[in-house]
Amino acid sequence: MAAACRRVPLNGYSPLVIIRPAIPAERDALEALQLRASLVNEGDREALLRHPDAIDLPMEQITAGAVFVVEQHGAVVGFSAIVAREDGDTELDALFVEPGTQRQGVGKRLVEHCAKVARSKGSTCLHVVGNPHAEQFYLACGFSIIGRFDTRFGPGLLMRLPL
């Protein structure tokens, strides 16, 4: 994967941002961002506080170039991670946006970037295990629900985006 950065406008109004691969030195800061973003959702807060081990960004994903950050004004405001699936498709394994920059297009740009990377690797679909609180976001990004199941945090959605 090329380490080149892409500059993209958010929502046509926001300043330019950079989407780039994460670096190992950012791991702790990204996990802290994940926690802040996760605690915004009151429906997940109690379960997350009972299971702090859920906040984990494997270093292997970062060193493999599978974690992407969005920088705005030099600050990281969101990140995503992808993993290869056994069926040849790609899983969106993480998607977190700073609470103060949510609903500004950061998450959508990360999904679009991950879809582009997955397509370049030969995947035909991008999959995600979605939280019901994020259902409308993923549907707006083009995902469809292909199943439902229970997780240790409550209900989960299996979703797929054709590439």
Question: At which residue positions do the language-model features occur?
Answer:
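Conserved N-terminal entry element of GNAT/NAT acetyltransferase domains
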Residues: A2-A25, L163
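Residues at or immediately flanking beta-strands
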Residues: I18, E91, C125-H127
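Acetyl-CoA-dependent GNAT
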Residues: P21-A94, E98-P99, V111-H113, V117, ...
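Short, flexible helix/strand-to-coil boundary loops that buttress conserved ligand/catalytic motifs
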Residues: Q34, C141-G142
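Glycine-rich ATP-binding loop(s) of histidine-kinase-like ATPases
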Residues: Q102
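Conserved G/P- and acidic residue-centered "switch" motifs that form tight phosphate/ATP-binding loops
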Residues: G105-G107
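C-terminal "cap" of GNAT-fold acetyltransferases
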Residues: T124, V128-Q136, C141, G147-L163
